[in-house]
Structures are given as C-alpha cells and as structure tokens.
Amino acid sequence: MGIRVYKPTTNGRRNMTSLDFAEITTSTPEKSLLVALKSKAGRNNNGRITVRHQGGGHKRFYRLVDFKRNKDNVEAVVKTIEYDPNRSANIALVHYTDGVKAYIIAPKGLEVGQRIVSGPEADIKVGNALPLANIPVGTLIHNIELKPGRGGELVRAAGASAQVLGSEGKYVLVRLQSGEVRMILGTCRATVGVVGNEQHGLVNLGKAGRSRWKGIRPTVRGSVMNPNDHPHGGGEGKAPVGRKAPSTPWGKPALGLKTRNKKAKSDKLIVRRRNEK
C-alpha cells in the first residue's frame, strides 16, 4: 500500500499524507461479523476517566476477528481485503469450505482467491496458522498465542513481525519486534508472514482534526496547568518543574521509572530483555 501526498492547497493539507488503499477490495463489511461498539470516551463503569485523551471520533462497528485460528484442516478462500477502523492492520474476509465466514488479520502478500488453512500439518505459507513447534527456524510470524487456545495476543499491529529462533524442550524461542527474545510454549499457535499495511506508520495526519476523527483528544502539558490539576502546574511564566524529578498527574515519578512488577512470573520466560544490547 502506497502513500498519497497532498498539495499544500490549505494549511491543513500542507505536509498531510494518507494511504492510497490500493489493497482494499471492498468498502462494505460482512454484516454477520459486525457488532455495535459503544463509545466509552476513556471512562470506566463509574463514569470516571481512566484513560486520558480519548473521546469523540467517528462512529465505528467492531469487526469480529478470529485470532484463535483453530478451525483445523478446513480450507478457506480469501474473498476480500478490508479496512478496519479499530486497528492499524487491514483484515481479510475468508470463506471456509464448510460455509463459515471469518475475518483474519491480513498479512503482507495475501491476495483475493488465495487458499489458507490452519492445523499442525499446514504448509509454511503466508496466512497459514500452525503450532510454533511445527514452524521452521527463521520463519517470520505474527498473531502469536501466549497460552494455547486463548488466541493470538502478540504481533498484531501493521507491519509487525516476530522470528522463530529455535526450540528448547517444550518451548520455542521467538524474537519479538521490540528485540526481546522470549520462550513460548510450542503448542501455542502463530500465523506465518508479516502483518500487512506496513506503510501505516509513515502517515502524517497533517492537522489536529484528523486526530479528532480517530477519537484522540489533545494532550496538554502539565506545566501549562494550574497547581491543582498537575504537579508541574502554577508559577509565573515558564516556571521549571520545581521537584526533584518530573511527575505524572498523580504525583508518581515519570520518565525512566520502571513500572514492571519485579515478581512477574513471566520473567523466567524472557531470555533477553528488549533494552539489552
């Protein structure tokens, strides 16, 4: 998918880019795979903001995407490649030979008419899903499970991929997009290939309004707030932070403080951290 560059006919158009959507084959989603999506605007069940900078935006339907890929040995044909407003990757509508329809994340190179299949005996071909233990070393994969049968949780964003490095007993070594090397059970499934729509990260929104269409509200600096709104607020003019270190709006240290639980059980499965050289 290419990048479309606009002429600077207005201030909002200057530097604006967008995807050309050349891979998209239809603009009409499969109705049976849509569910209503209520806008939460970052609020929890008490009506309190739990995630800042969310609200507004275009109304969306949620597409039911199959992350489990557990329909073994039943072939499916790719019918369409579609835009999904709820994620950075595109999705593909597949029709199984037994009549079932499903959405999957569209990997790079997947085309309409292509046949895909899931299961331990599946070929190492883009779009096929199989257990990690059955995937050869060096293969690029995405949509990786962390627990067998729970569905893919890792490597689902546009352009993302992980690589199989080897095996160690019942575990398989996988290098993630961040550089972290992690052991994952060999019975966990993954899909072969790189997630498509890899140009997504190169898009320049160009104006504030496009962020609002996406449901993203402005991010205001703490230093321009009042003291009752943020620890950095108050003072005359451009005042410094006034504390030992920068703080979050709730008074906790920001910038550099490690937030990972030191007793996390999954530590033993991480062979190399993402920030290790």
Swiss-Prot record:
Region of interest (Disordered), residue spans: 219-277
Gene3D superfamilies attached to this UniProt entry: 2.30.30.30, Nucleic acid-binding proteins, Ribosomal protein L2, domain 3
Statement: the UniProt record of this protein carries the keyword Disulfide bond: no
SUPFAM superfamilies: Nucleic acid-binding proteins, Translation proteins SH3-like domain
InterPro entries attached to this UniProt entry: NA-bd_OB-fold (IPR012340), Rib_uL2_dom2 (IPR014722), Ribosomal_uL2 (IPR002171), Ribosomal_uL2_bac/org-type (IPR005880), Ribosomal_uL2_C (IPR022669), Ribosomal_uL2_CS (IPR022671), Ribosomal_uL2_dom3 (IPR014726), Ribosomal_uL2_RNA-bd_dom (IPR022666)
SMART domains reported in the protein's UniProt record: Ribosomal_L2, Ribosomal_L2_C
Isomerase found in the keyword field: no
GO process annotations (BP): cytoplasmic translation
GO terms for cellular component: large ribosomal subunit
Pfam families from the UniProt entry: Ribosomal_L2 (PF00181), Ribosomal_L2_C (PF03947)
Keywords: Ribonucleoprotein, Ribosomal protein, RNA-binding, rRNA-binding
Example of a GO MF term: transferase activity
Biased segments, Basic and acidic residues type: 264-277
Family stated for the protein in its record: Belongs to the universal ribosomal protein uL2 family.
Quaternary context: Part of the 50S ribosomal subunit. Forms a bridge to the 30S subunit in the 70S ribosome.
Annotated function: One of the primary rRNA binding proteins. Required for association of the 30S and 50S subunits to form the 70S ribosome, for tRNA binding and peptide bond formation. It has been suggested to have peptidyltransferase activity; this is somewhat controversial. Makes several contacts with the 16S rRNA in the 70S ribosome.
Protein name: Large ribosomal subunit protein uL2
Species classification: Bacteria, Bacillati, Bacillota, Bacilli, Lactobacillales
